[in-house]
């Protein structure tokens, strides 16, 4: 098997001197520390295989010499040489030598050119451009992240289809150009064919055109004779009818004058009555104003009186309550005085009883001196013997006395608290009743207040709206008056203007659809600055009356003559000779056409404006107007904003004060609207004033609301005071008293129980003491004859103590009663003082109420007097209004009669005007028909007169124009026409319907023929010559089209050939790789479940779009390449590299650190695959840093660095074939089991 044997390098990069690297085995790994020069082996192989210098990590070729990178090249030359051994054993050498700044190539030690050198490399399977035997460091990682388009480019390099890109693009560009030329020639041929058809049609149309002209001429003669014949008949009938109507009209005019005089007299009487009514209304308004002032004063006085009366009632009620309380207080004082008198009587009775007892004691036992001494001695013995018990007894008695006094005090307090509690309950009941009354009164006030508030809101809203509207109306009215005053026209119009306005109104009534109005009323300038200029251009036509037709204009002129009114200018829409607009004038700078600065709401009026203004131009200044009028190739009619007019003839007409006066007519046309609006606003203002008078009612309601609110406030304050202060205080006091009462009762119970218990103990101690006394005083008692010593002592000692105690109790009770009596009397005195104060207040309030009632009565009297006067004036107004309405009714009746006669006169005038209009219309029709015959050269025969005498009516002054027209019509009446050529059936027609129907038929025939002639283009005299020219051009275009189509077919064939070659080269490579990559990926992964597949984005031309590459790792679901791990991406990239290598296999394959991104598992898989493939497929040389990988190789080449001035590389070799590959055997065994 062919293989790379040795690599000989000399002074190349890190290799100093001549170094031999090899021999290389089927699977050789190059190892060494980082920076030792391993990758320089890869660069040496690339260099010797013809790689470009730019791809060898240097800028120029001399940097490849050892030491050049530090500026100390060891030699001026360097070389790299490989020894390649064929399967037959034949050796081939390839060498590349650096000499100076270039390199030379040697094959088998013979100097050859680069192309020969590359060809020899391709013979052994090494393609330099595709780099099919070298995989540089990082290439594997870059392959895994290539974009589909980049992957396509990679395949084009491998398949060599990329060499055809230039030729492919060139052929494609030529094909597109040829197809475009063919399409262009085809379109040209089609257009010339259409021209040929058109030329044929022109020839046929020229022949038809002449026959149509002859037929049209005969029909026009018949039409004109028919119209002239029946026109003359109609003129004769109208003259007869006009004489009858004029006689009836003169009779009706006399009746109209009579009724007009009656109406004027009635109007004068109505004016006098109206003035009287206005004076009455003025007085009534004054009275109502005064009444509106007095009525609130009366209401206020009434409310004040009512308020004081209520205060007086409250005071009286307070006196009544205070007197009731005083009466009760007096009863309590009497009870206390009675109790005090009873106590004094009992005390006196007790003292009297004591005196009797003292007299009785003098008769009782009395001891001798010896016995008394012995008593004292025995008593001292007893005292000493019972001293302890006596002390305890005295203590108990003192405590007992204290508790008894406390019990008596608590019982007194109990009685007092019960009395106070009863009084508090009564006061609470009184306040509750007061609360009920106040709540009821408050509710009544609130209901009344709510009702009045609603009325107030309604009135306020109505009055505010009225005031707002009055303000708006007054502003509008002031604005209208200001506009009228500014215009200087807020005065009565002159009789002349009024007469002209009445005449115009009369004409509008006679011809409502035909008389439009004066020209300045129907249009206006778009801005005020153009008013003078437009007025100047309009000239005498500014006050002209615009009518629909010439017939109406003539009827109006006849009416003016009959009414002896001032002459008027009429502009008939159907009679105006309008010149076309020169559109080029609109493009001139510094000016505008006059017709463009005039605005109108009537579309039909544009013809009139165009007739009056022509092609006139308006300019900002006089200089601009002069320049535009005189400086151009043609003179123009121009006008400046100040009214200066430049005519084409060179005449200059300046603006004047008279022109400014005339220009005011643009504002005068708004007068009628302004006056109408002023009348409407005045009437509306009167209605609003009536509504505004409701302010009096509003003030009354507001006064009532204010009084009610005040009363409600006082009531609510009192209610709140009672609820939140008085009643709460009473409830708190009641609660305190009840609590105090419970405390007193519980205290009394506790004291009673304590007294009972202590009394028992006192009794026990007393019995013990008594027994001791009895023992000691036994003999003494027997001597004095008493049962025991206590009997003696009670009679003489204890009785005195009881008397003293009783006196003390009497004293205490008397003191208590005196204190209570003094307090009650003091309280009663305060109540009486309060009652006296309230009585004084009542007396003063009564006096104030008397004064207030008098003021109220005075106000009421004034209001009643004003109301009576108001009613009197209203009655007068009703009477005056009735009289005015009666006279107005009479005026209306007379006016109806006047209008009825006026309508009859108008009807007759309208009929006269209508007949005259019809007559003038018929004369005009005859004139126009004769004029048409002359102008259109229609050959009718005249028995008298000549068509040459027919002239067009010229526009001069109105009087001149009317007289000229009459002269022309009289002259034309003398013409006698020969109707012998007119068909008899057309002469025999009588009714207007039949005449109109036949006229329409004749007109349709002529119009149809004219329409055909109009639609038919004038014949082309050169149609035959054009037809021949077009035929020659058609033949030329046909020849050009065939030639371009042939050229396009040839370009298509050439392009398809290149496309097929490129497609075949690319597809051959792609199909081989896409088939083999799946098996290679399975072998690399050591698992048949792994999948790898390639798919083109453009199956028809895959080299134009991208190529997708996807792998499914064992045990994982499908996911995009970007989502695979680093090791999986590396394995997938290696599979692609090995698959591409299998398409164009090189004899050896050099890889630079392809295992960098692989983990130990994937390293084992990749190394096993490489081991298998190197047995019989290709030679593999790998630069590796991982022991798991290079331990599987057949031989190792070690690269290590040495240093002096610069680093240089050394090489070691080791044959591993003598060492068994146990790991590889185990891996193969596991792989076999997994299968």
Curated annotation (Swiss-Prot):
Record localization: Nucleus; Chromosome; Chromosome, Centromere
Principal place of residence: nucleus
CDD domains cross-referenced by the UniProt entry: ABC_SMC1_euk (cd03275)
All residue ranges annotated as the SMC hinge domain in the record: 514-629
The protein's assembly and partners: Forms a heterodimer with SMC3. Component of a meiosis-specific cohesin complex, probably composed of the SMC1B and SMC3 heterodimer attached via their SMC hinge domain, RAD21 (or its meiosis-specific related protein REC8), which link them, and STAG3, which interacts with RAD21 or REC8. The cohesin complex interacts with the cohesin loading complex subunits NIPBL/Scc2 (via HEAT repeats) and MAU2/Scc4. NIPBL directly contacts all members of the complex, RAD21, SMC1A/B, SMC3 and STAG1.
Family indicated by similarity: Belongs to the SMC family. SMC1 subfamily.
Protein name in UniProt: Structural maintenance of chromosomes protein 1B
Gene this protein is translated from: SMC1B
């Amino acid at each position: 098997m062919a293989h790379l044997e040795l690599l000989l390098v000399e002074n190349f990069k890190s290799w100093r001197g001549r170094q031999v690297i090899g021999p290389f085995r089927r699977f050789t790994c190059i190892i060494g520390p980082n920076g030792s020069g391993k990758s320089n082996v890869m660069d040496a192989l690339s260099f010797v295989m013809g790689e470009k210098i730019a791809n060898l990590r240097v800028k120029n070729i001399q940097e490849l010499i050892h030491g050049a990178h530090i500026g100390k090249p060891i030699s001026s030359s360097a070389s790299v040489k490989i020894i390649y051994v064929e399967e037959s054993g034949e050796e081939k050498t390839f060498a590349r030598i650096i000499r100076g700044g270039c390199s030379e190539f040697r094959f088998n030690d013979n100097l050859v050119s680069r192309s020969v050198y590359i060809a020899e490399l391709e013979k052994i399977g090494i393609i330099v451009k595709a780099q099919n035997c070298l995989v540089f460091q990082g290439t594997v990682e870059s392959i895994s992240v290539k974009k589909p388009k980049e992957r396509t480019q990679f395949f084009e390099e491998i398949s060599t289809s990329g060499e055809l890109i230039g030729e492919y693009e060139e052929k494609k560009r030529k094909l597109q150009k040829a197809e475009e030329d063919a399409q262009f020639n085809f379109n040209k041929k089609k257009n010339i064919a259409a021209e040929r058809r058109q030329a044929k049609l022109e020839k046929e149309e020229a022949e038809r055109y002449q026959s149509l002209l002859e037929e049209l001429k005969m029909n026009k003669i018949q039409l004109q004779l028919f119209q002239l014949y029946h026109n003359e008949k109609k003129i004769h009938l109208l003259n007869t009818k006009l004489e009858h109507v004029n006689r009836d009209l003169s009779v009706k005019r006399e009746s109209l004058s009579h009724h007009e005089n009656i109406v004027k007299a009635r109007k004068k009487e109505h004016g006098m009555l109206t003035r009287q009514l206005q004076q009455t209304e003025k007085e009534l308004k004054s009275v109502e104003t005064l009444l509106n002032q007095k009525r609130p004063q009366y209401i206020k006085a009434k409310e004040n009186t009512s308020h004081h009366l209520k205060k007086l009632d409250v005071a009286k009620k307070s006196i009544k309550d205070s007197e009731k309380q005083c009466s009760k207080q007096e009863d309590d004082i009497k009870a206390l005085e009675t109790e005090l008198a009873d106590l004094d009587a009992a005390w006196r009775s007790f003292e009297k009883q004591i005196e009797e007892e003292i007299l009785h004691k003098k008769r009782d036992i009395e001891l001798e001196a010896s016995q008394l001494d012995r008593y004292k001695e025995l008593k001292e013995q007893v005292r000493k013997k019972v001293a302890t018990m006596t002390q305890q007894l005295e203590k108990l008695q003192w405590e007992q006395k204290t508790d008894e006094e406390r019990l008596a005090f608590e019982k007194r307090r109990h009685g007092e608290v019960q009395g106070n509690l009863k009084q508090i309950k009564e006061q609470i009941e009184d306040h509750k009743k007061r609360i009920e009354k106040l709540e009821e009164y408050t509710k009544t006030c609130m209901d009344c207040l709510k009702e009045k508030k609603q009325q107030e809101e309604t009135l306020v809203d109505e009055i505010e709206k009225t005031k707002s509207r009055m303000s708006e109306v007054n502003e509008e009215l002031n604005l209208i008056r200001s506009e009228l005053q500014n215009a200087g026209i807020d005065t009565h119009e002159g009789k002349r203007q009024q007469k002209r306005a009445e005449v115009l109104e009369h004409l509008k009534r006679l011809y409502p659809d035909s008389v439009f109005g004066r020209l300045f009323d129907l249009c206006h300038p778009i801005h005020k600055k153009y008013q003078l200029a437009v007025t100047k251009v309009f000239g005498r036509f500014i006050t002209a009356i615009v009518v629909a037709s010439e017939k109406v204009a003539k009827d109006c002129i006849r009416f003016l003559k009959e009414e002896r009114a001032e002459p008027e200018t009429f502009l008939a829409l159907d009679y105006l000779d309008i010149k076309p607009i020169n559109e080029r004038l609109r493009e001139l700078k510094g000016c505008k056409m006059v017709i463009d600065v005039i605005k109108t709401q009537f579309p039909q009026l544009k013809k009139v404006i165009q007739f009056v203004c022509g092609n006139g131009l308006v300019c900002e200044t006089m200089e601009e107007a002069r320049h535009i009028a005189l400086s151009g190739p043609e003179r123009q009619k121009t006008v400046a904003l100040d009214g200066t007019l430049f005519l084409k003839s060179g005449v200059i007409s300046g603006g004047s004060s008279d022109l400014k006066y005339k220009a005011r007519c643009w504002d005068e046309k708004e007068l009628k609207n302004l006056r109408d609006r002023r009348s409407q606003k005045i009437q509306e203002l009167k209605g609003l004033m009536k509504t505004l008078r409701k302010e009096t009612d509003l003030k009354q309601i507001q006064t009532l609301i204010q009084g009610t609110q005040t009363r409600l406030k006082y009531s609510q304050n009192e209610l709140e005071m009672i609820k939140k202060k008085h009643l709460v205080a009473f409830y708190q006091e009641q609660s305190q008293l009840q609590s105090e009462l419970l405390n007193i009762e519980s205290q009394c119970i506790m004291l009673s129980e304590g007294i009972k218990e202590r009394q028992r103990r006192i009794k026990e101690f007393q019995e013990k003491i008594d027994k001791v006394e009895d023992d000691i005083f036994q003999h003494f008692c027997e001597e004095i004859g008493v049962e025991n010593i206590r009997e003696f002592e009670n009679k003489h000692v204890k009785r005195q103590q009881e008397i003293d105690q009783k006196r003390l109790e009497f004293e205490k009770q008397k003191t208590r009663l005196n204190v209570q009596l003094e307090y009650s009397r003091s309280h009663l005195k305060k109540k009486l003082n309060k009652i006296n104060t309230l009585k004084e207040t009542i007396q003063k309030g009564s006096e104030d109420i008397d004064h207030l009632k008098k003021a109220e009565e005075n106000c009421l009297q004034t209001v009643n007097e004003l109301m009576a006067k108001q009613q009197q004036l209203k009655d007068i107004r009703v009477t005056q209004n009735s009289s005015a309405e009666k006279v107005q009714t009479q005026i209306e009746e007379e006016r109806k009669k006047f209008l009825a006669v006026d309508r009859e006169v108008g009807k007759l005038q309208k009929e006269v005007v209508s007949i005259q209009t019809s007559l003038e219309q018929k004369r005009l029709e005859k004139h126009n028909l004769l004029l048409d015959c002359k102008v259109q050269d229609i050959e009718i025969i005249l028995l008298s007169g000549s068509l040459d005498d027919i002239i067009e009516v010229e526009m001069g002054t109105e009087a001149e124009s009317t007289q000229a027209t009459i002269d022309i019509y009289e002259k034309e009446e003398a013409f006698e026409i020969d109707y012998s050529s007119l068909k008899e059936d057309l002469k025999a027609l009588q009714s207007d319907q039949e005449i109109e129907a036949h006229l329409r038929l004749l007109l349709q025939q002529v119009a149809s023929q004219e329409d055909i002639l109009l639609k038919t283009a004038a014949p082309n005299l050169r149609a035959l010559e054009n037809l021949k020219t077009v035929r020659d051009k058609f033949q030329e275009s046909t020849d050009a089209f065939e030639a371009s189509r042939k050229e396009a077919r040839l370009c298509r064939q050439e392009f398809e050939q290149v496309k097929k070659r490129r497609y075949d080269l690319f597809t051959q490579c792609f199909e081989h790789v896409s088939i083999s990559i799946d098996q290679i990926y399975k072998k690399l992964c050591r698992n048949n479940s792994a999948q790898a597949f390639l798919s083109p984005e453009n199956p028809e031309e895959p080299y134009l779009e991208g190529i997708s590459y996807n792998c499914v790792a064992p045990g994982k679901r499908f996911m995009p390449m970007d989502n695979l791990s680093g090791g999986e991406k590396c394995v997938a990239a290696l599979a692609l590299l090995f698959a591409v290598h299998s398409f164009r296999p090189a004899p050896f394959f050099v890889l630079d650190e392809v295992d960098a991104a692989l983990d130990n598992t994937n390293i084992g898989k990749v190394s096993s695959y490489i081991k298998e493939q190197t047995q019989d497929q290709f030679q593999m040389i790998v630069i590796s840093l991982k022991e798991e990988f290079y331990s599987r190789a057949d031989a190792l080449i070690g690269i290590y660095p040495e240093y002096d001035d610069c680093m240089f590389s050394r090489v070691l070799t080791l044959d591993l074939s003598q060492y068994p590959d146990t790991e590889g055997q185990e891996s193969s065994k596991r792989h076999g089991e997994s299968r």
